[in-house]
Amino acid sequence: MSFSSGKFLFVFLFFFFFKNTSCSNQRKYITKQQTMSKDKKEHKDKKRKHDNEDVEIADSKKQRKLEKQEKKDKKDKKDKKEKKEKKEKKHKKEKKHKDSESSPVEPAANDSSSSTNYTQSSKLSSVSQSDIDKFLSDNEITVEDPSSSSLRPILSFDQVQLTSAITSKLSKFDKPTPIQSVSWPFLLSGKDVIGVAETGSGKTFAFGVPAINNIITTGNTKTLSVLCISPTRELALQIYDNLIELTADSGVNCVAVYGGVSKDDQIRKIKTANVVVATPGRLVDLINDGAINLGKVNYLVLDEADRMLEKGFEEDIKTIISNTSNSERQTLMFTATWPKEVRELANNFMNSPVKVTVGDRDELSANKRITQVVEVINKFDKEKKLIQLLRKYNANESSDNKILIFALYKKEASRIENFLKRNRFSVAAIHGDLSQQQRTAALSAFKSGQSNLLLATDVAARGLDIPNVKVVINLTFPLTIEDYVHRIGRTGRAGAKGTAHTLFTEDEKHLSGALCNILRGANQPVPEELLKFGGHTKKKAHSVYGAFYKDVDMTKTAKKIKFD
Protein backbone atom coordinates (compact mmCIF):
# COMPACT_ATOMS: atom_id res chain seq x y z
CA MET A 1 0.00 0.00 0.00
CA SER A 2 1.42 3.29 -1.01
CA PHE A 3 1.60 6.24 1.32
CA SER A 4 -1.10 8.08 -0.55
CA SER A 5 -3.41 5.10 -0.28
CA GLY A 6 -2.80 4.88 3.43
CA LYS A 7 -3.41 8.57 3.84
CA PHE A 8 -6.64 8.29 2.00
CA LEU A 9 -7.74 5.41 4.18
CA PHE A 10 -6.87 7.34 7.30
CA VAL A 11 -8.84 10.35 6.12
CA PHE A 12 -11.75 8.14 5.22
CA LEU A 13 -11.80 6.37 8.59
CA PHE A 14 -11.43 9.65 10.46
CA PHE A 15 -14.26 11.17 8.51
CA PHE A 16 -16.44 8.10 9.07
CA PHE A 17 -15.74 8.06 12.79
CA PHE A 18 -16.34 11.79 13.12
CA LYS A 19 -19.61 11.54 11.23
CA ASN A 20 -20.86 8.67 13.40
CA THR A 21 -19.85 10.50 16.51
CA SER A 22 -21.48 13.65 15.27
CA CYS A 23 -24.68 11.78 14.40
CA SER A 24 -24.68 10.11 17.77
CA ASN A 25 -24.22 13.42 19.51
CA GLN A 26 -26.82 14.94 17.31
CA ARG A 27 -29.24 12.16 18.16
CA LYS A 28 -28.50 12.61 21.83
CA TYR A 29 -28.99 16.32 21.51
CA ILE A 30 -32.26 15.84 19.64
CA THR A 31 -33.43 13.31 22.23
CA LYS A 32 -32.43 15.68 24.98
CA GLN A 33 -34.19 18.54 23.28
CA GLN A 34 -37.28 16.40 22.81
CA THR A 35 -37.20 15.38 26.47
CA MET A 36 -36.74 18.98 27.54
CA SER A 37 -39.51 20.06 25.23
CA LYS A 38 -41.76 17.36 26.63
CA ASP A 39 -40.90 18.31 30.21
CA LYS A 40 -41.43 21.93 29.39
CA LYS A 41 -44.78 21.14 27.84
CA GLU A 42 -45.79 19.03 30.81
CA HIS A 43 -44.68 21.82 33.12
CA LYS A 44 -46.68 24.32 31.09
CA ASP A 45 -49.70 22.04 31.10
CA LYS A 46 -49.30 21.51 34.83
CA LYS A 47 -48.91 25.22 35.41
CA ARG A 48 -51.88 25.97 33.19
CA LYS A 49 -53.94 23.38 35.07
CA HIS A 50 -52.81 24.81 38.40
CA ASP A 51 -53.64 28.32 37.19
CA ASN A 52 -57.05 27.11 36.07
CA GLU A 53 -57.58 25.50 39.47
CA ASP A 54 -56.53 28.73 41.18
CA VAL A 55 -58.98 30.62 39.02
CA GLU A 56 -61.71 28.10 39.82
CA ILE A 57 -60.93 28.31 43.56
CA ALA A 58 -60.89 32.09 43.37
CA ASP A 59 -64.18 32.04 41.48
CA SER A 60 -65.61 29.61 44.05
CA LYS A 61 -64.44 31.78 46.94
CA LYS A 62 -65.83 34.83 45.23
CA GLN A 63 -69.14 33.03 44.65
CA ARG A 64 -69.31 31.93 48.28
CA LYS A 65 -68.48 35.43 49.41
CA LEU A 66 -71.21 36.84 47.20
CA GLU A 67 -73.71 34.27 48.50
CA LYS A 68 -72.68 35.03 52.07
CA GLN A 69 -73.03 38.77 51.46
CA GLU A 70 -76.40 38.19 49.82
CA LYS A 71 -77.58 36.16 52.82
CA LYS A 72 -76.28 38.84 55.18
CA ASP A 73 -78.06 41.55 53.20
CA LYS A 74 -81.30 39.55 53.29
CA LYS A 75 -80.94 38.95 57.04
CA ASP A 76 -80.13 42.62 57.68
CA LYS A 77 -83.11 43.62 55.59
CA LYS A 78 -85.35 41.18 57.48
CA ASP A 79 -84.02 42.30 60.88
CA LYS A 80 -84.46 45.90 59.89
CA LYS A 81 -88.04 45.21 58.82
CA GLU A 82 -88.81 43.29 62.02
CA LYS A 83 -87.19 46.01 64.11
CA LYS A 84 -89.24 48.62 62.31
CA GLU A 85 -92.46 46.63 62.78
CA LYS A 86 -91.61 46.05 66.45
CA LYS A 87 -90.89 49.75 66.91
CA GLU A 88 -94.15 50.70 65.19
CA LYS A 89 -96.04 48.17 67.33
CA LYS A 90 -94.41 49.49 70.49
CA HIS A 91 -95.14 53.06 69.41
CA LYS A 92 -98.79 52.17 68.80
CA LYS A 93 -99.01 50.50 72.23
CA GLU A 94 -97.35 53.46 73.94
CA LYS A 95 -99.64 55.84 72.10
CA LYS A 96 -102.66 53.77 73.03
CA HIS A 97 -101.49 53.58 76.65
CA LYS A 98 -100.77 57.32 76.69
CA ASP A 99 -104.19 58.05 75.24
CA SER A 100 -105.80 55.81 77.84
CA GLU A 101 -104.02 57.69 80.62
CA SER A 102 -104.62 61.17 79.24
CA SER A 103 -108.25 60.66 78.27
CA PRO A 104 -110.91 59.86 80.89
CA VAL A 105 -112.09 56.26 80.99
CA GLU A 106 -115.75 55.99 80.13
CA PRO A 107 -117.99 53.43 81.86
CA ALA A 108 -119.96 50.87 79.90
CA ALA A 109 -122.68 52.41 77.78
CA ASN A 110 -126.16 51.93 79.24
CA ASP A 111 -128.50 50.66 76.55
CA SER A 112 -131.96 49.19 76.82
CA SER A 113 -130.77 45.64 76.31
CA SER A 114 -128.12 45.77 78.99
CA SER A 115 -128.54 44.66 82.59
CA THR A 116 -126.78 47.87 83.65
CA ASN A 117 -130.25 49.47 83.72
CA TYR A 118 -130.52 48.59 87.39
CA THR A 119 -133.83 49.29 89.08
CA GLN A 120 -134.21 48.98 92.83
CA SER A 121 -136.85 46.36 93.67
CA SER A 122 -139.97 47.22 95.65
CA LYS A 123 -138.92 44.77 98.38
CA LEU A 124 -135.66 46.62 98.89
CA SER A 125 -137.42 49.98 98.80
CA SER A 126 -139.72 48.84 101.60
CA VAL A 127 -136.81 48.21 103.99
CA SER A 128 -136.58 50.98 106.57
CA GLN A 129 -133.57 53.30 106.53
CA SER A 130 -132.82 52.37 110.14
CA ASP A 131 -132.38 48.71 109.10
CA ILE A 132 -130.07 49.79 106.27
CA ASP A 133 -128.00 51.92 108.65
CA LYS A 134 -127.81 49.08 111.17
CA PHE A 135 -126.60 46.68 108.47
CA LEU A 136 -123.86 49.10 107.39
CA SER A 137 -122.84 49.78 110.99
CA ASP A 138 -122.80 46.14 112.12
CA ASN A 139 -120.58 45.14 109.19
CA GLU A 140 -118.34 48.25 109.40
CA ILE A 141 -119.19 49.19 105.80
CA THR A 142 -118.36 52.57 104.30
CA VAL A 143 -119.35 53.66 100.80
CA GLU A 144 -117.68 56.54 98.94
CA ASP A 145 -119.73 57.39 95.85
CA PRO A 146 -118.64 60.47 93.83
CA SER A 147 -122.05 60.61 92.13
CA SER A 148 -123.98 60.41 95.43
CA SER A 149 -126.41 57.92 93.90
CA SER A 150 -127.09 56.39 97.36
CA LEU A 151 -127.94 52.91 96.11
CA ARG A 152 -129.15 50.69 98.92
CA PRO A 153 -127.37 47.43 99.80
CA ILE A 154 -129.18 44.23 98.77
CA LEU A 155 -129.95 42.41 102.03
CA SER A 156 -131.51 39.26 100.53
CA PHE A 157 -131.52 37.51 97.15
CA ASP A 158 -135.21 38.24 96.57
CA GLN A 159 -134.45 41.99 96.63
CA VAL A 160 -132.57 41.90 93.31
CA GLN A 161 -133.72 40.97 89.82
CA LEU A 162 -131.33 38.44 88.29
CA THR A 163 -131.75 35.85 85.55
CA SER A 164 -133.24 32.52 86.61
CA ALA A 165 -129.95 30.78 85.72
CA ILE A 166 -128.11 32.91 88.29
CA THR A 167 -130.87 32.84 90.92
CA SER A 168 -130.91 29.03 90.94
CA LYS A 169 -127.15 28.97 91.65
CA LEU A 170 -127.56 31.33 94.62
CA SER A 171 -130.35 29.34 96.24
CA LYS A 172 -127.91 27.30 98.35
CA PHE A 173 -126.74 30.46 100.15
CA ASP A 174 -128.74 32.16 102.92
CA LYS A 175 -128.02 35.75 101.94
CA PRO A 176 -125.40 37.90 100.17
CA THR A 177 -122.16 38.62 102.01
CA PRO A 178 -121.57 42.28 103.00
CA ILE A 179 -119.28 43.00 100.02
CA GLN A 180 -121.85 41.45 97.66
CA SER A 181 -124.75 43.32 99.24
CA VAL A 182 -123.15 46.73 98.78
CA SER A 183 -121.31 46.26 95.46
CA TRP A 184 -124.05 44.55 93.40
CA PRO A 185 -126.29 47.64 92.97
CA PHE A 186 -123.36 49.72 91.68
CA LEU A 187 -122.02 46.94 89.43
CA LEU A 188 -125.45 46.23 87.98
CA SER A 189 -125.70 49.98 87.29
CA GLY A 190 -122.51 49.88 85.19
CA LYS A 191 -120.31 51.83 87.61
CA ASP A 192 -116.62 51.29 88.29
CA VAL A 193 -116.19 49.80 91.77
CA ILE A 194 -113.31 49.40 94.22
CA GLY A 195 -113.97 46.70 96.82
CA VAL A 196 -111.71 46.71 99.88
CA ALA A 197 -112.45 43.67 102.04
CA GLU A 198 -110.73 40.80 103.80
CA THR A 199 -109.99 37.57 101.96
CA GLY A 200 -112.82 35.05 102.15
CA SER A 201 -115.51 37.72 102.04
CA GLY A 202 -117.20 36.48 98.85
CA LYS A 203 -115.48 38.82 96.38
CA THR A 204 -115.59 36.31 93.50
CA PHE A 205 -119.40 36.22 93.46
CA ALA A 206 -119.41 39.97 94.14
CA PHE A 207 -117.99 40.61 90.66
CA GLY A 208 -118.99 37.29 89.07
CA VAL A 209 -122.77 37.52 89.48
CA PRO A 210 -123.18 40.91 87.69
CA ALA A 211 -120.73 39.84 84.95
CA ILE A 212 -122.45 36.54 84.10
CA ASN A 213 -125.91 38.04 84.54
CA ASN A 214 -125.05 40.75 82.00
CA ILE A 215 -123.79 38.23 79.42
CA ILE A 216 -126.93 36.09 79.77
CA THR A 217 -129.25 39.11 79.62
CA THR A 218 -127.66 40.62 76.51
CA GLY A 219 -127.11 37.25 74.82
CA ASN A 220 -123.54 38.29 74.05
CA THR A 221 -122.06 34.78 73.97
CA LYS A 222 -119.98 35.13 70.79
CA THR A 223 -117.23 37.45 72.02
CA LEU A 224 -114.78 37.71 74.90
CA SER A 225 -116.34 40.41 77.08
CA VAL A 226 -115.25 39.62 80.67
CA LEU A 227 -111.63 39.49 81.83
CA CYS A 228 -110.47 38.78 85.38
CA ILE A 229 -106.79 39.10 86.32
CA SER A 230 -105.40 37.45 89.47
CA PRO A 231 -101.85 37.26 90.87
CA THR A 232 -101.35 33.48 91.15
CA ARG A 233 -102.23 30.31 89.28
CA GLU A 234 -103.96 28.85 92.33
CA LEU A 235 -106.19 31.89 92.76
CA ALA A 236 -106.95 31.97 89.02
CA LEU A 237 -108.09 28.34 89.16
CA GLN A 238 -110.17 29.03 92.26
CA ILE A 239 -111.95 31.97 90.59
CA TYR A 240 -112.43 29.82 87.48
CA ASP A 241 -114.05 27.04 89.56
CA ASN A 242 -116.45 29.53 91.17
CA LEU A 243 -117.39 31.08 87.83
CA ILE A 244 -117.91 27.64 86.28
CA GLU A 245 -120.44 27.05 89.05
CA LEU A 246 -122.26 30.24 88.01
CA THR A 247 -122.08 29.59 84.25
CA ALA A 248 -123.23 25.95 84.31
CA ASP A 249 -126.04 25.34 81.76
CA SER A 250 -126.09 29.03 80.80
CA GLY A 251 -124.26 28.93 77.46
CA VAL A 252 -121.49 31.15 78.85
CA ASN A 253 -118.00 29.75 78.23
CA CYS A 254 -115.32 30.40 80.87
CA VAL A 255 -111.57 29.70 80.39
CA ALA A 256 -108.60 29.86 82.78
CA VAL A 257 -105.24 31.08 81.44
CA TYR A 258 -102.08 30.67 83.54
CA GLY A 259 -98.43 29.68 83.32
CA GLY A 260 -96.79 26.34 84.06
CA VAL A 261 -98.78 24.48 81.39
CA SER A 262 -98.82 24.39 77.59
CA LYS A 263 -100.20 27.42 75.74
CA ASP A 264 -101.69 25.42 72.86
CA ASP A 265 -104.74 24.10 74.68
CA GLN A 266 -105.40 27.50 76.25
CA ILE A 267 -105.15 29.27 72.87
CA ARG A 268 -107.64 26.80 71.39
CA LYS A 269 -110.15 27.37 74.22
CA ILE A 270 -109.79 31.17 74.12
CA LYS A 271 -111.31 31.26 70.63
CA THR A 272 -114.78 30.45 72.02
CA ALA A 273 -114.42 32.09 75.46
CA ASN A 274 -116.78 34.73 76.87
CA VAL A 275 -114.99 34.95 80.22
CA VAL A 276 -111.23 34.63 80.74
CA VAL A 277 -109.55 34.34 84.15
CA ALA A 278 -105.81 34.90 83.76
CA THR A 279 -102.52 35.53 85.50
CA PRO A 280 -100.73 38.66 84.21
CA GLY A 281 -97.58 36.98 82.86
CA ARG A 282 -99.29 34.36 80.71
CA LEU A 283 -101.88 36.85 79.44
CA VAL A 284 -99.16 39.29 78.30
CA ASP A 285 -97.42 36.39 76.50
CA LEU A 286 -100.63 35.61 74.62
CA ILE A 287 -101.12 39.29 73.77
CA ASN A 288 -97.58 39.49 72.37
CA ASP A 289 -98.17 36.27 70.39
CA GLY A 290 -101.36 37.74 68.92
CA ALA A 291 -103.30 34.78 70.32
CA ILE A 292 -105.92 36.79 72.19
CA ASN A 293 -107.94 39.90 71.34
CA LEU A 294 -109.10 42.05 74.27
CA GLY A 295 -110.65 44.73 72.09
CA LYS A 296 -114.22 43.84 73.07
CA VAL A 297 -113.64 43.34 76.79
CA ASN A 298 -116.14 45.61 78.56
CA TYR A 299 -115.92 44.15 82.08
CA LEU A 300 -112.41 44.10 83.59
CA VAL A 301 -111.68 42.76 87.08
CA LEU A 302 -108.39 43.22 88.95
CA ASP A 303 -108.60 40.75 91.84
CA GLU A 304 -106.10 40.97 94.72
CA ALA A 305 -104.75 44.17 93.13
CA ASP A 306 -102.42 44.88 96.05
CA ARG A 307 -100.87 41.42 95.74
CA MET A 308 -100.29 41.87 92.00
CA LEU A 309 -98.43 45.13 92.61
CA GLU A 310 -96.38 43.49 95.37
CA LYS A 311 -95.34 40.78 92.91
CA GLY A 312 -94.19 43.39 90.36
CA PHE A 313 -97.02 43.02 87.83
CA GLU A 314 -97.71 46.76 87.46
CA GLU A 315 -96.30 47.05 83.92
CA ASP A 316 -98.09 43.87 82.84
CA ILE A 317 -101.37 45.25 84.19
CA LYS A 318 -100.86 48.49 82.26
CA THR A 319 -100.15 46.52 79.07
CA ILE A 320 -103.29 44.43 79.54
CA ILE A 321 -105.51 47.43 80.26
CA SER A 322 -104.15 49.33 77.25
CA ASN A 323 -105.31 46.45 75.02
CA THR A 324 -108.93 46.68 76.19
CA SER A 325 -111.63 49.04 74.97
CA ASN A 326 -111.47 52.23 77.04
CA SER A 327 -114.75 53.66 75.76
CA GLU A 328 -116.87 50.70 76.86
CA ARG A 329 -114.93 49.23 79.76
CA GLN A 330 -116.35 48.85 83.26
CA THR A 331 -113.42 48.37 85.64
CA LEU A 332 -113.53 46.63 89.01
CA MET A 333 -110.76 46.40 91.56
CA PHE A 334 -110.84 44.13 94.60
CA THR A 335 -108.11 44.33 97.21
CA ALA A 336 -107.50 43.38 100.83
CA THR A 337 -105.49 46.54 101.57
CA TRP A 338 -105.52 50.11 100.23
CA PRO A 339 -101.88 51.27 99.88
CA LYS A 340 -100.67 54.25 97.84
CA GLU A 341 -99.68 52.10 94.82
CA VAL A 342 -103.19 50.65 94.54
CA ARG A 343 -104.73 54.13 94.85
CA GLU A 344 -102.54 55.40 91.99
CA LEU A 345 -103.54 52.43 89.80
CA ALA A 346 -107.20 53.17 90.47
CA ASN A 347 -106.74 56.86 89.65
CA ASN A 348 -105.12 56.04 86.30
CA PHE A 349 -107.56 53.47 84.95
CA MET A 350 -110.92 53.95 86.66
CA ASN A 351 -113.65 56.49 86.03
CA SER A 352 -115.18 58.00 89.18
CA PRO A 353 -115.15 54.66 91.00
CA VAL A 354 -117.39 53.85 93.95
CA LYS A 355 -115.24 52.68 96.85
CA VAL A 356 -116.81 50.05 99.12
CA THR A 357 -114.86 49.22 102.29
CA VAL A 358 -115.80 46.38 104.63
CA GLY A 359 -114.05 46.81 107.99
CA ASP A 360 -111.18 49.19 108.75
CA ARG A 361 -108.93 48.29 105.81
CA ASP A 362 -106.74 51.42 105.81
CA GLU A 363 -104.97 50.00 108.88
CA LEU A 364 -103.74 46.42 108.70
CA SER A 365 -105.87 44.27 110.98
CA ALA A 366 -106.62 40.60 111.54
CA ASN A 367 -109.98 38.88 111.45
CA LYS A 368 -111.41 39.05 115.00
CA ARG A 369 -113.11 35.68 114.57
CA ILE A 370 -109.68 34.02 114.55
CA THR A 371 -108.14 32.90 117.85
CA GLN A 372 -104.44 33.76 117.57
CA VAL A 373 -101.94 31.74 119.61
CA VAL A 374 -98.27 32.80 119.50
CA GLU A 375 -95.54 30.65 121.04
CA VAL A 376 -91.94 31.84 121.31
CA ILE A 377 -89.66 28.79 120.94
CA ASN A 378 -86.13 27.76 120.03
CA LYS A 379 -85.83 27.44 116.25
CA PHE A 380 -84.36 23.92 116.59
CA ASP A 381 -87.52 22.69 118.33
CA LYS A 382 -89.90 23.45 115.44
CA GLU A 383 -90.33 19.90 114.11
CA LYS A 384 -90.91 18.48 117.59
CA LYS A 385 -93.44 21.22 118.36
CA LEU A 386 -95.21 20.68 115.03
CA ILE A 387 -95.88 17.02 115.84
CA GLN A 388 -97.29 18.07 119.23
CA LEU A 389 -99.60 20.63 117.60
CA LEU A 390 -100.87 18.16 115.00
CA ARG A 391 -101.75 15.72 117.77
CA LYS A 392 -103.34 18.52 119.78
CA TYR A 393 -105.56 19.56 116.87
CA ASN A 394 -106.40 15.94 116.05
CA ALA A 395 -104.71 15.79 112.64
CA ASN A 396 -105.45 12.19 111.76
CA GLU A 397 -107.11 10.64 108.73
CA SER A 398 -110.40 9.99 110.53
CA SER A 399 -110.69 13.64 111.65
CA ASP A 400 -112.60 16.31 109.76
CA ASN A 401 -110.25 19.04 111.01
CA LYS A 402 -108.51 20.66 108.05
CA ILE A 403 -105.11 22.05 109.03
CA LEU A 404 -103.04 24.38 106.85
CA ILE A 405 -99.30 24.55 107.65
CA PHE A 406 -97.18 27.41 106.32
CA ALA A 407 -93.44 27.16 105.67
CA LEU A 408 -91.36 30.10 104.45
CA TYR A 409 -89.39 28.62 101.54
CA LYS A 410 -90.00 25.76 99.12
CA LYS A 411 -86.93 23.81 100.31
CA GLU A 412 -88.20 23.98 103.87
CA ALA A 413 -91.66 22.90 102.69
CA SER A 414 -90.20 19.91 100.85
CA ARG A 415 -88.17 18.89 103.92
CA ILE A 416 -91.16 19.21 106.28
CA GLU A 417 -93.36 17.27 103.85
CA ASN A 418 -90.95 14.32 103.95
CA PHE A 419 -90.63 14.67 107.74
CA LEU A 420 -94.41 14.44 108.22
CA LYS A 421 -94.71 11.46 105.86
CA ARG A 422 -91.99 9.64 107.83
CA ASN A 423 -94.12 10.26 110.92
CA ARG A 424 -97.11 8.70 109.15
CA PHE A 425 -99.13 11.85 108.50
CA SER A 426 -101.11 12.08 105.27
CA VAL A 427 -100.05 15.46 103.89
CA ALA A 428 -100.56 17.30 100.59
CA ALA A 429 -98.23 20.13 99.55
CA ILE A 430 -98.13 23.15 97.26
CA HIS A 431 -94.83 24.93 96.71
CA GLY A 432 -92.52 26.07 93.91
CA ASP A 433 -90.71 22.74 93.42
CA LEU A 434 -93.93 21.05 92.35
CA SER A 435 -95.48 21.16 88.88
CA GLN A 436 -98.80 22.89 88.30
CA GLN A 437 -100.52 19.50 87.97
CA GLN A 438 -99.09 18.32 91.31
CA ARG A 439 -100.13 21.54 93.05
CA THR A 440 -103.65 21.35 91.62
CA ALA A 441 -103.97 17.70 92.66
CA ALA A 442 -102.75 18.51 96.20
CA LEU A 443 -105.23 21.37 96.54
CA SER A 444 -108.08 19.18 95.27
CA ALA A 445 -107.14 16.41 97.73
CA PHE A 446 -107.22 18.89 100.61
CA LYS A 447 -110.52 20.46 99.55
CA SER A 448 -112.21 17.09 99.09
CA GLY A 449 -111.01 15.81 102.46
CA GLN A 450 -108.83 13.09 100.97
CA SER A 451 -106.00 14.71 102.93
CA ASN A 452 -106.68 16.87 106.00
CA LEU A 453 -103.17 18.37 106.09
CA LEU A 454 -101.92 20.90 103.53
CA LEU A 455 -98.36 22.22 103.63
CA ALA A 456 -97.82 25.44 101.68
CA THR A 457 -95.48 28.33 101.08
CA ASP A 458 -96.78 31.86 100.60
CA VAL A 459 -97.95 31.07 97.05
CA ALA A 460 -101.16 29.96 98.80
CA ALA A 461 -101.27 32.74 101.37
CA ARG A 462 -103.57 35.02 99.41
CA GLY A 463 -106.98 34.54 97.90
CA LEU A 464 -107.36 30.78 98.08
CA ASP A 465 -110.84 29.93 99.27
CA ILE A 466 -110.50 26.58 101.04
CA PRO A 467 -113.68 25.90 103.02
CA ASN A 468 -113.68 24.65 106.60
CA VAL A 469 -110.02 25.21 107.47
CA LYS A 470 -110.07 24.90 111.25
CA VAL A 471 -106.43 25.63 112.05
CA VAL A 472 -103.56 27.53 110.44
CA ILE A 473 -100.07 26.73 111.75
CA ASN A 474 -97.25 29.16 110.99
CA LEU A 475 -94.24 26.86 111.23
CA THR A 476 -91.94 29.69 110.14
CA PHE A 477 -93.03 33.30 110.50
CA PRO A 478 -93.40 35.14 107.15
CA LEU A 479 -91.14 37.96 105.97
CA THR A 480 -93.75 40.68 106.53
CA ILE A 481 -96.59 41.27 108.97
CA GLU A 482 -98.92 41.70 105.97
CA ASP A 483 -98.21 38.12 104.91
CA TYR A 484 -98.93 36.98 108.48
CA VAL A 485 -102.40 38.55 108.32
CA HIS A 486 -103.05 37.02 104.89
CA ARG A 487 -101.86 33.59 106.06
CA ILE A 488 -104.11 33.39 109.11
CA GLY A 489 -106.97 34.68 106.95
CA ARG A 490 -107.24 31.16 105.45
CA THR A 491 -109.32 30.24 108.51
CA GLY A 492 -112.32 32.04 110.00
CA ARG A 493 -113.83 32.63 106.56
CA ALA A 494 -117.45 33.33 105.61
CA GLY A 495 -118.47 34.07 109.20
CA ALA A 496 -116.88 30.94 110.69
CA LYS A 497 -114.39 30.83 113.57
CA GLY A 498 -110.84 29.51 113.37
CA THR A 499 -107.49 29.18 115.12
CA ALA A 500 -104.05 30.41 114.05
CA HIS A 501 -101.08 28.93 115.92
CA THR A 502 -97.75 30.67 115.27
CA LEU A 503 -94.25 29.52 116.21
CA PHE A 504 -92.09 32.62 116.74
CA THR A 505 -88.28 32.55 117.16
CA GLU A 506 -85.56 35.06 117.91
CA ASP A 507 -84.81 35.27 114.17
CA GLU A 508 -88.10 37.15 113.68
CA LYS A 509 -87.73 39.55 116.62
CA HIS A 510 -87.65 42.57 114.28
CA LEU A 511 -91.35 41.85 113.58
CA SER A 512 -92.33 41.44 117.23
CA GLY A 513 -93.66 45.00 117.59
CA ALA A 514 -95.88 44.74 114.50
CA LEU A 515 -97.16 41.34 115.64
CA CYS A 516 -98.01 42.75 119.08
CA ASN A 517 -100.02 45.51 117.37
CA ILE A 518 -101.98 42.97 115.31
CA LEU A 519 -102.73 40.88 118.41
CA ARG A 520 -103.90 43.90 120.40
CA GLY A 521 -106.02 45.15 117.49
CA ALA A 522 -107.85 41.81 117.37
CA ASN A 523 -108.24 41.68 121.19
CA GLN A 524 -105.88 38.70 121.42
CA PRO A 525 -103.48 37.99 124.33
CA VAL A 526 -99.86 39.08 123.84
CA PRO A 527 -97.39 36.56 125.36
CA GLU A 528 -94.76 37.88 127.78
CA GLU A 529 -91.98 36.17 125.80
CA LEU A 530 -92.95 38.22 122.74
CA LEU A 531 -92.88 41.49 124.70
CA LYS A 532 -89.30 40.76 125.78
CA PHE A 533 -88.12 41.35 122.21
CA GLY A 534 -89.25 44.97 122.49
CA GLY A 535 -91.93 46.93 120.73
CA HIS A 536 -89.91 48.23 117.79
CA THR A 537 -91.26 47.78 114.29
CA LYS A 538 -89.03 47.25 111.29
CA LYS A 539 -89.45 49.84 108.56
CA LYS A 540 -91.25 48.40 105.57
CA ALA A 541 -88.79 48.06 102.69
CA HIS A 542 -89.49 48.76 99.03
CA SER A 543 -89.43 45.58 96.90
CA VAL A 544 -86.72 47.04 94.61
CA TYR A 545 -85.01 49.94 96.39
CA GLY A 546 -84.90 48.54 99.94
CA ALA A 547 -85.54 50.26 103.27
CA PHE A 548 -84.06 53.63 102.27
CA TYR A 549 -86.39 54.21 99.34
CA LYS A 550 -87.97 57.66 99.42
CA ASP A 551 -91.65 57.51 98.56
CA VAL A 552 -92.07 60.40 96.12
CA ASP A 553 -95.36 61.53 94.62
CA MET A 554 -94.61 61.27 90.89
CA THR A 555 -97.82 63.09 89.96
CA LYS A 556 -96.44 66.42 91.19
CA THR A 557 -94.53 68.58 88.73
CA ALA A 558 -90.93 69.44 89.51
CA LYS A 559 -90.16 72.85 90.92
CA LYS A 560 -88.13 75.00 88.55
CA ILE A 561 -85.13 76.71 90.15
CA LYS A 562 -83.61 79.82 88.58
CA PHE A 563 -80.10 81.04 89.34
CA ASP A 564 -79.31 84.74 89.01
From Swiss-Prot:
PROSITE patterns: DEAD_ATP_HELICASE, HELICASE_ATP_BIND_1, HELICASE_CTER, Q_MOTIF. It catalyses: ATP + H2O = ADP + phosphate + H(+). Residues 58-73 have a biased composition (Basic and acidic residues). GO terms for biological process: endonucleolytic cleavage in ITS1 upstream of 5.8S rRNA from tricistronic rRNA transcript (SSU-rRNA, 5.8S rRNA, LSU-rRNA); rRNA processing. It is an enzyme of class 3 (hydrolase). Residues 385-534 form the Helicase C-terminal domain. The keyword rRNA processing applies. A motif (Q motif) lies at residues 155-181. Residues 184-356 form the Helicase ATP-binding domain. Its EC number is 3.6.4.13. One of its GO terms (cellular component) is preribosome, large subunit precursor. Belongs to the DEAD box helicase family. DDX5/DBP2 subfamily. The Q motif is unique to and characteristic of the DEAD box family of RNA helicases and controls ATP binding and hydrolysis. This is ATP-dependent RNA helicase DBP3. It comes from Candida albicans (strain SC5314 / ATCC MYA-2876). The gene is DBP3.
